[in-house]
């Protein structure tokens, strides 16, 4: 097959000007965030906080190194556009090889490294972003900033690995509940369980002077992280993972550091996953019962709830169920990149069980927001679930619900747990949970 390239000099000249402008925006963005991302300050004066800060600082330094390579590619690309069509084609081929080699070296470091780098890349473009304040649902909620060439450049760079960041990737590989790999993931066997498991990684809580206890509620295991000096405040933390993954190391880091820095006791329900027979019809009432038990024991003002992704689904569905049963609700709730409408994937059908996928127990986006506590919703513009957060915002406005939203530009799914920018928002979230001044 013969391929043809049609080169229009005037069009290429205009394109070169646009691309050069994009490069200027990206360069300015990278410079603007260099200090914040390469020298992340420790949240407290302790070894664990310093280690976490060093980890994210290393991520920022890696991104700056990659940005330098991309700048070389960009400069050559602009030169190629300015030249003749033949020169453009040759330069594009040469620079594509250069860019490919950079990503190839990352691939050689393993799947986990690639996943982390991809998750960090979009966040580094948010120049000047520190901490996004929430806005009430009654206000006009939009993602701060407007689409730009930098956004297109960023999204284009992520396109080859887009499936890794999408829930559809989980659907493709894990759609069948009896998949042997799903059984392995849920097996809680080391060393896999150190990264995806039903208990914190070894030594983490010992280093923080915390006590980890294992109890059960209605047949559901509950992990309790008690700090050295508890304040009497309790957080029910519901992990995400598309209803098929146990808590990750990022969840346990967040829960443990939160308990350490605030003195709140964190309770993590290990609810049955889809491959273990878990369905919305059984898990949501059990989750609501656990939260109600905590409220009965410690008082409404001392109990709050946080959930990310699928955990955000469970948190909202459980609160709606508590209202429907006439039970008190927690003092506040924080939803991080919540998956509120599970759609029609095979995983969704399995989670729904005998219920319709638009039943509020399955997809709480279709439930009532009346009677719910003050709720804070975090979402990012690059999150496939961001549209659901916008729909929730509109519903909250119509129903007059006490909801506030953080719609952050250039942020990915679960950015609060996975990126340096999320780390900056942890103190704000602790305040919203009522466990920090």
Swiss-Prot record:
Active site: 309, 383, 413
UniProtKB keywords: Cell wall, Cytoplasm, Hydrolase, Lipid degradation, Lipid metabolism, Secreted, Virulence
Enzyme Commission no: 3.1.1.3
Domain PE: 1-100
Record has Secreted as a keyword: yes
Motif (Involved in the stabilization of the negatively charged intermediate by the formation of the oxyanion hole) on chain: 239-241
UniProt enzyme class: hydrolase
Coiled coil segments of this chain: none
Gene Ontology terms: biological process: lipid catabolic process
A GO MF term: triacylglycerol lipase activity
Residues under site feature: Cleavage: 149-150
One annotated Gene Ontology cellular component of this protein: cell surface
Entry PTM: Upon export, the PE domain is removed by proteolytic cleavage. Cleavage occurs at the cell surface and is not required for secretion. Cleaved after Gly-149 by the aspartic protease PecA. May also be cleaved before Leu-98 and after Ala-136.
Regulation: Also inhibited by CaCl(2), CoCl(2), MnCl(2), ZnCl(2) and MgCl(2). Inhibited by several hydrazides compounds. Stimulated slightly by SDS at concentrations up to 2 mM, above which the activity is severely inhibited.
This protein's record includes keyword Lipid metabolism: yes
Region entry Lipase, spans: 207-437
Protein name listed in UniProt: Triacylglycerol lipase
UniProt organism field: Mycobacterium tuberculosis (strain ATCC 25618 / H37Rv)
Gene giving rise to this polypeptide: lipY
